[in-house]
């Protein structure tokens, strides 16, 4: 699967697991010109992007469109998972945890830092579990919390953070 588009590989693998699955793929880079068209018809957005510019863009549009957002970030042995329901005005935002000016793709770069496969797997599985809980309406999501995963030392912890107002682009 090297040098193949991730979206094509993912769609193929999902169809192998369940051929009845309806999959809509987008083969363009997500940007401010196409994001609204892409996410407007979905209730829950699961973000697996690998850079903070895209994560902040998704966060801003989910906030504007009042979507539910589950986002994950990974680097080496570390992972972060957030769940936001922007229909609820008390929900914090990704920018309440990560300060946009303090985060650069140079500091958190999967291509440079590398990613351990199990880190991606655990963060992705946790995001899928959060989505299932939202769909079914059971359990507690990570509202105004971050799940911090440290696989090197096998630590999992939740940290609360507060909502602060910020201006979207």
Tell me what each language-model feature is.
Residues 1-169:
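Adenine nucleotide-associated cytosolic modules
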